Amino acid sequence: MSGGAGVPDLPQIDASGMKVGIVASTWHSTICDALLDGALKVTESANVSEPTVVRVLGAIEIPVVAQALAADHEAVIALGVVIRGQTPHFDYVCDAVTQGLTRVSLDASTPVANGVLTTNTEEQALDRAGLPGSAEDKGAQAAAAALSTALTLQGLRGRS
């Protein structure tokens, strides 16, 4: 599945036996539910049985739950959406979420895929949510990134 210029096709992944956590916000439910659906389709096609799914209200809550998931999962997928408003709040939330997820990933040595959309408009978010007519499926892309990175790390850690 390719969404546009420069977007690679999603790889075929076999993550059988991998413990995967997904944290998804509920704000802008149509978008977040679609992102979650895309991620779940990828985990299912990669033979991940029963990923742990945790829902939180907003994007700012995602990093702390991702941190808890990273403690006992091999891959974490973070999903949500922040849409620019008329105040600087957008910038603060986007920065906090991005830095928080990066810190969790590095501190836990666990891939945490950032599937939190940061858009100027709701239309841009809908176009990336994996809905019918959307140009991209960022939930699926985040899941593929988390799983493929976890497999890469398994390979690196398995070397003597």
From Swiss-Prot:
The active site is at residue 89. It holds the Pfam family DMRL_synthase. GO terms for biological process: riboflavin biosynthetic process. It comes from the Bacteria. GO terms for cellular component: cytosol; riboflavin synthase complex. (2S)-2-hydroxy-3-oxobutyl phosphate binds at residues 86-87, 128. It is an enzyme of class 2 (transferase). Keywords: Riboflavin biosynthesis, Transferase. GO terms for molecular function: 6,7-dimethyl-8-ribityllumazine synthase activity. Its EC number is 2.5.1.78. Belongs to the DMRL synthase family. Homopentamer. Catalyzes the formation of 6,7-dimethyl-8-ribityllumazine by condensation of 5-amino-6-(D-ribitylamino)uracil with 3,4-dihydroxy-2-butanone 4-phosphate. This is the penultimate step in the biosynthesis of riboflavin. HAMAP family: Lumazine_synth. This is 6,7-dimethyl-8-ribityllumazine synthase. It comes from Mycobacterium sp. (strain KMS).
